[in-house]
Design a protein with these regions (language model features):
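N-terminal beta1-alpha1-beta2 module of alpha/beta enzyme domains
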Residues: 2-95, 218-221, 346, 441-445
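Conserved, mostly hydrophobic/aromatic
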Residues: 13, 50, 54, 92, ...
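Alpha-helix-loop-beta-strand connector modules within alpha/beta enzyme cores
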Residues: 73-101, 266-267, 407-423
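Hydrophobic faces of well-ordered beta-strands that scaffold small-molecule active sites
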Residues: 11-15, 58-60, 99-105, 130-134, ...
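C-terminal structured "cap/appendage" subdomains that terminate the fold
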Residues: 381-426
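Short, acidic/polar
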Residues: 37-49, 225-235, 373-386
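Hydrophobic, small-residue-rich alpha-helical packing segments that form membrane-like cores
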Residues: 4, 14-17, 29-41, 48, ...
């Protein structure tokens, strides 16, 4: 192998599996599994297929509330029921060996001790394959499920998240890697000098510690983030090992990639220690025309009522009262996701879309989509990789199981043939497969 070939960058691939498709019409697609997000047998099969294809990770996002949308829209949604991620992923850990397992943990409605303990447990159960997707929870209806009338202000959620991260990682470092002696003869189970009590006192949390579970196999589970606002980008640059990005064009991807890596350099972090993975809906056909027809059938499954609900979520305001055939009116700022709102307003303006057209796009999928043959899809992925628009992708399958099987059976071999995706896992842990270092213990190393 030449030096150039050895130095060639390769893709990392995650699978976005909650909801089982980002597309609201997916459960209605011909021969799709309409119960795929609440059927363990199906999900087990999906995870095992992803592992066969050498995917880096299975990503299980989470929602802490049924969306408070009109029943005409809600009754058409397949996202009203799904497994709780930290119950599902240990079950998947038992039926897989190398696939990374990423779950969402809210920094707004959880407590650091609970999150630290759960993810440390998952890391041990899985043999070092756990990852924590750090979210501040933008859904304004979630607060009502926790006895809180008003959602926390956007930037304050991120300030709380930063302290939350410090507490969780401090708890993971409670024990030195060699703390547990388990000397049967002397009766000494652990070395007290290798235990650190956190004693954290901050603006949002008071946590004594230590954590009552040994240090995770990976040191820390992989830290994932998905914020795209100014506060979200900065949190990712400071803390994350991977970021799920939203970029509809290569130019957008390059700008985001450069911004995140530059922020890391300014903070003294190695930019190579962050993997930028844009979300990408992939529809595969034998020909480009067949793939486009599949996408058209998929989009035809979106009802206007559910499309308007998706638009309302993106904007953070009720869009059902807007004139469907008029332009998008001025949208006031809200306390939900800032980046999602800005992307939606920009899309409407750039393409001169009516409210109805915009809703249909949001109800289907308005982000990055690659619709074509295995070759043309691989061409696009290779272009993004070589142009520094990404380090890989968080793949969104259009429908299940066919969409997943098409990608695994047809696109992955094409990527492997080009030498831009692995044929075997690099190691047993998610950090090894992502090419990430094991964090040093801040109290003992």
């Amino acid at each position: 192998m030449t030096a150039a070939a050895e130095a060639r960058r390769t893709l990392h691939l995650g699978a976005f599996m909650r909801p089982v498709s980002i597309h609201t019409g997916a459960w209605r697609y011909p021969e799709a599994y309409p119960d795929a997000n609440f059927n363990f047998g199906h999900i087990k099969r999906f995870a095992q297929r992803l592992e066969t294809a050498k995917f880096d990770a299975f990503f299980m996002a989470d929602h802490l509330a049924v969306l408070n949308t009109p029943m005409e829209a809600l009754k058409r949604s397949a996202t009203v029921t799904s497994f709780e991620p930290m119950t599902l992923l240990p079950a998947l850990a038992a039926v897989t060996e190398r696939l990374g397992l990423i779950a969402t943990g809210s920094t707004t409605y959880e407590e650091p001790f609970h999150v630290a303990r759960r993810f440390a447990s998952l890391d041990h159960i899985s043999g070092g394959r756990a990852a924590w997707n750090v979210v501040t929870t933008s859904n304004p209806h979630a607060s009502l499920n926790f006895g809180i009338e008003e959602q926390m202000e956007h930037d304050e959620r991120y300030r709380r998240a930063r302290e939350f991260y410090d507490v969780v990682t401090g708890l993971w470092d409670s024990w030195a890697d060699d703390a547990f002696i388990r000397d049967v003869e002397s009766g000494l189970y652990f070395d007290p000098a290798r235990l650190h009590t956190l004693e954290h006192e901050g603006q949002y949390f008071s946590v004594r510690g230590p954590l009552n579970i040994g240090r995770p196999i990976q040191g820390w589970p992989v830290i994932v983030q998905a914020g795209a606002s100014e506060a979200g980008r900065q949190l990712a640059a400071e803390t994350a090992d991977a970021i799920f990005a939203s970029a509809r064009t290569l130019e957008d991807g390059q700008a985001f990639y450069s911004d995140i890596k530059t922020r890391m350099e300014k903070l003294g972090r190695n930019p190579d220690h962050m993997k930028v993975l844009p979300g990408c809906l992939v529809v595969v056909g034998k020909t480009i025309e067949e793939a486009q027809e599949k996408r058209a059938v998929l989009d035809s499954g979106v009802h206007y009522e559910s499309a308007v609900a998706s638009l309302s979520i993106a904007l953070g305001t009720d869009a059902s009262a807007f004139d469907p055939d008029g332009p998008l009116p001025d949208i006031p700022e809200t306390n939900t996701s800032q980046s999602g709102r800005e992307r939606t307003i920009k899309l409407a303006a750039q393409e001169n879309l009516t409210v109805r057209q915009l809703a249909q796009r949001l109800g289907g999928y308005s982000g990055l989509a690659m619709v074509g043959t295995p070759k043309t899809i691989a061409d696009q992925m290779e272009e993004w990789l070589e142009a520094c628009g990404c380090d890989g992708f968080n793949i969104m399958f259009p429908y299940l199981p066919e969409g997943l099987d098409d990608f695994v059976d047809k696109v992955v071999p094409e990527l492997q043939k080009r030498g831009i995706f692995r044929s075997e896992y690099e190691g047993p842990t998610l950090r090894e497969n992502l090419g990430l270092p094991r964090p040093k213990n801040q109290f003992f190393d």
